[in-house]
């Protein structure tokens, strides 16, 4: 039995915690709010995030991070990107006190605004400055709602150490979620982060009533943008043809379970961003990630017109119809160009 500390009692953190408990591991779940911790402990539900679903009753929750991290072998992070650094700082303080060096698994998908750093880079800054070997990223086409119902799912675990990725693979895998390993944590993180931006665009097209041709074109050209940024960051181009690339892009751009898609859909129907985000009730990672992506594109002169248009619509007041016209009137060129 492995002792796992899951940080973040949102939908994905709760589902992963329950799944790991199903696998026979001891799981403690950190919740930011006492009311959620109490509900999980008393009723084994988390109704604010997941309706009609019950957690494995062996999962226990607490707002005391020191208690949650006590004697843990693995720390699973499932908190918003905007909170990842502050949570990492708190984790480091606890680890300094107890002297443990657990594996760090990130299920967070995003790029930090301001620093433009990926999550494992933040872990290196705040927790393990000597290297990346004990850090693993978990990413792929995996909506919490489907995994909660034990729908068949495949996910990637990536680390600079394939041996450590394989150790996590054995801990996480079961008969309804299959995990694959990768030695490209950079590419896997970029795929998981930037697909959220493309999903907002996919939702906008759906909200405007565009059909299958437009959706397919958007996802394909969106994948080209993701690959372009990933390679610039040091990722391997073939990673983006896998689960954390095209796989995650497909599920996020085509499902009503996607918060980013739902955000875009409402924008396409004419609702302002502030109203959409207020009504969502959960974090829309793509709306934050696009800020970092836009700055990265400008800094490195990367051609990412879809991402740039989403940024302009969200934060510069650009009109959606005007951005679509600009997109379709761009200079003609070859399809394949990294």
Swiss-Prot record:
Transmembrane segments: none annotated. It is found in: Cytoplasm. Its main location: cytoplasm. The active site is at residue 195. InterPro entries: 6-PGluconate_DH-like_C_sf, 6PGD_dom2, G3P_DH_NAD-dep, G3P_DH_NAD-dep_C, G3P_DH_NAD-dep_N, NAD(P)-bd_dom_sf. PROSITE patterns: NAD_G3PDH. GO terms for biological process: carbohydrate metabolic process; glycerol-3-phosphate biosynthetic process; glycerol-3-phosphate catabolic process; glycerophospholipid metabolic process; phospholipid biosynthetic process. NADPH binds at residues 11-12, 32-33, 109, 144, 259, 283, 285. One of its GO terms (cellular component) is cytosol. It holds the Pfam family NAD_Gly3P_dh_C. One of its GO terms (molecular function) is glycerol-3-phosphate dehydrogenase [NAD(P)+] activity. Its EC number is 1.1.1.94. Keywords: Cytoplasm, Lipid biosynthesis, Lipid metabolism, NAD, NADP, Nucleotide-binding, Oxidoreductase, Phospholipid biosynthesis, Phospholipid metabolism. Sn-glycerol 3-phosphate binds at residues 109, 140, 142, 195, 248, 258-260. Pathway: Membrane lipid metabolism; glycerophospholipid metabolism. It catalyses: sn-glycerol 3-phosphate + NAD(+) = dihydroxyacetone phosphate + NADH + H(+); sn-glycerol 3-phosphate + NADP(+) = dihydroxyacetone phosphate + NADPH + H(+). PANTHER family: GLYCEROL-3-PHOSPHATE DEHYDROGENASE (PTHR11728), GLYCEROL-3-PHOSPHATE DEHYDROGENASE [NAD(+)] 2, CHLOROPLASTIC (PTHR11728:SF1). Belongs to the NAD-dependent glycerol-3-phosphate dehydrogenase family. HAMAP family: NAD_Glyc3P_dehydrog. Catalyzes the reduction of the glycolytic intermediate dihydroxyacetone phosphate (DHAP) to sn-glycerol 3-phosphate (G3P), the key precursor for phospholipid synthesis. This is Glycerol-3-phosphate dehydrogenase [NAD(P)+] 1. It comes from Lactobacillus delbrueckii subsp. bulgaricus (strain ATCC 11842 / DSM 20081 / BCRC 10696 / JCM 1002 / NBRC 13953 / NCIMB 11778 / NCTC 12712 / WDCM 00102 / Lb 14).
């Amino acid at each position: 039995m492995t002792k796992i500390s899951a940080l973040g009692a949102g939908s994905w953190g709760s589902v992963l915690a329950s799944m790991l408990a199903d696998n026979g591991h001891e799981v403690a779940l950190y919740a930011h709010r006492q009311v959620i911790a109490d509900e999980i402990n008393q009723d084994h539900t988390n109704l604010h995030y997941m309706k009609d679903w019950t957690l494995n009753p062996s999962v226990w929750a607490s707002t005391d991070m020191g208690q949650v991290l006590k004697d843990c072998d693995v720390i699973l992070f499932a908190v918003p990107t905007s909170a990842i650094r502050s949570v990492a700082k708190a984790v480091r303080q606890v680890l300094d006190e107890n002297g443990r060096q657990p594996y760090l698994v990130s299920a967070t998908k995003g790029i930090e605004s301001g620093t433009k750093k990926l999550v494992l880079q933040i872990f290196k800054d705040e927790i393990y400055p000597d290297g990346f070997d004990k850090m693993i990223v978990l990413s792929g086409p995996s909506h919490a709602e489907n995994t909660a119902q034990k729908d068949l799912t495949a996910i990637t675990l990536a680390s600079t150490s394939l041996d450590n990725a394989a150790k996590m693979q054995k801990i996480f895998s079961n008969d309804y979620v299959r995990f694959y390993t990768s030695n490209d944590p950079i590419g896997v993180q970029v795929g998981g982060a930037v697909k959220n931006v493309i999903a907002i665009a996919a939702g906008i097209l759906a909200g405007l009533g565009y059909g299958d041709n437009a959706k397919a074109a958007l996802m394909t050209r969106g994948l080209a943008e993701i690959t372009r940024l990933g390679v610039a960051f040091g990722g391997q181009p073939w990673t983006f043809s896998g689960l954390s690339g095209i796989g995650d892009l497909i599920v996020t751009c085509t499902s009503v379970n996607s918060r980013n898609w739902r955000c875009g859909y409402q924008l396409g129907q004419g609702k302002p961003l502030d109203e959409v985000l207020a009504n969502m009730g959960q974090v829309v990672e793509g709306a934050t990630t696009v800020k970092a992506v836009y700055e990265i594109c400008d800094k490195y002169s990367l051609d990412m017109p879809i991402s740039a248009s989403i940024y302009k619509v969200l934060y510069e007041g650009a009109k959606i119809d005007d951005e679509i016209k600009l997109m379709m009137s761009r200079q003609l060129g070859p399809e394949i160009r990294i």
